[in-house]
Amino acid sequence: MEEQQPEPKSQRDSALGAAAAATPGGLSLSLSPGASGSSGSGSDGDSVPVSPQPAPPSPPAAPCLPPLAHHPHLPPHPPPPPPQHLAAPAHQPQPAAQLHRTTNFFIDNILRPDFGCKKEQPPPQLLVAAAARGGAGGGGRVERDRGQTAAGRDPVHPLGTRAPGAASLLCAPDANCGPPDGSQPAAAGAGASKAGNPAAAAAAAAAAVAAAAAAAAAKPSDTGGGGSGGGAGSPGAQGTKYPEHGNPAILLMGSANGGPVVKTDSQQPLVWPAWVYCTRYSDRPSSGPRTRKLKKKKNEKEDKRPRTAFTAEQLQRLKAEFQANRYITEQRRQTLAQELSLNESQIKIWFQNKRAKIKKATGIKNGLALHLMAQGLYNHSTTTVQDKDESE
């Protein structure tokens, strides 16, 4: 095998030169004689996508690629590395993909409690496939929308959930949608070249082979095929994606099937909305009084004591007792209260008032007051009326 390799290289060079001279605007593919023979081992040198060159011809050695050695532990169709002159233009269509990027969530996902949480990153092969489909033009967007529809509109993992049902988009090795020996990359490259982007043809072909290998690896997890793929094919993954009993205090809206979860009062306390805590006049108990509480009426004991109306006999006995002793004793007060049918407090207050009147009538208070009264500067002497005193 090592001695026969230079001959396919020379044949490939001549075939590429003839194809470039005949059709400069088309896409030329060359197959080695080993691929059409009986020893078709499916190696990497079977199909090599080459980007078309403009009107001026390029050197014949530039588009040539050396065949890679076959490893039995690799997938049947690993992605061939792009040439050096195609690696730089392959990253140019990404700004266009960012401008026409569609939203990857719906309104039912916003209501789920785990919306916005960081998810695990998809495989790098799927990221390359997504970038290639985004740069391929309108066809890439159609395939992306079709993948979301086939995945049951579950956009939490827009790339990860597409892998089990990738047979509807990309041909897996065990599917019946076409021969896996290079016709699928050729079709993808032709579609990209018709769209007017020849630089993305090789990248799209390589990404298609990588996505097909990833779909073949993830095929045993979904036995329903590509039509029923997505998150609905694997209930285990769906359960881990949206745990139903992860946090009962947060899972108020949304469950595994998207319906509302009804929580009773025994399971969870009443949760007030956010606006309740921003206003005072609400229905919560701690909002404060809306009306002023009425003042408690004072009891009759706290009211002012009514004026006591003494009889003539009572006033005569009190004045006689005051003449005998201006300060009545407790024992004498109790005896007088029983004789006159009065309270002890009434007798005590009458004696206090009588002493205050006499003190005010005499005007003898202190030395300073006497000195001022002698100079005529302090004269507060009052005349008492006997009738008023007797009535009291």
Curated annotation (Swiss-Prot):
UniProt feature, compositional bias: Pro residues: 51-66, 75-84
Record feature DNA-binding region, as residue ranges: 303-362
Region spans: Disordered: 1-100, 132-164, 219-251, 282-306
Subcellular localization(s) per the UniProt record: Nucleus
Main location (coarse class): nucleus
GO MF terms held by the record: DNA-binding transcription factor activity, RNA polymerase II-specific; DNA-binding transcription repressor activity, RNA polymerase II-specific; RNA polymerase II cis-regulatory region sequence-specific DNA binding; sequence-specific double-stranded DNA binding
Keywords: Developmental protein, DNA-binding, Dwarfism, Homeobox, Nucleus
Low complexity composition bias: residue spans: 14-36, 85-100
Ranges of Gly residues composition bias in the record: 223-236
Gene Ontology biological process: adult locomotory behavior; anatomical structure morphogenesis; central nervous system neuron differentiation; cerebellum development; dopaminergic neuron differentiation; dorsal/ventral pattern formation; drinking behavior; embryonic brain development
One of the record's GO cellular component terms: chromatin
PANTHER family linked: HOMEOBOX PROTEIN ENGRAILED, HOMEOBOX PROTEIN ENGRAILED-1
Disease involvement: ENDOVE syndrome, limb-only type: An autosomal recessive disorder characterized by severe shortening and deformation of the legs and feet, 3/4 syndactyly of the hands, and toenails partially displaced to plantar surface. Radiographs show normal femora but severely shortened tibiae, triangular fibulae and malformed or absent bones in the feet. In addition, genitourinary anomalies have been observed. ENDOVE syndrome, limb-brain type: An autosomal recessive disorder characterized by marked mesomelic shortening of the lower limbs, severe hypoplasia of the tibia and fibula, absent talus, and rudimentary and short foot bones. Hands show short and malformed fingers with a missing digit, and nails are absent on some fingers. Affected individuals manifest neurologic symptoms including seizures and generalized hypotonia. Brain imaging reveals absence of the cerebellum and hypoplasia of the brain stem.
Purpose: Required for proper formation of the apical ectodermal ridge and correct dorsal-ventral patterning in the limb.
Family of the protein in this entry: Belongs to the engrailed homeobox family.
Protein's UniProt name: Homeobox protein engrailed-1
Organism per entry: Homo sapiens (Human)
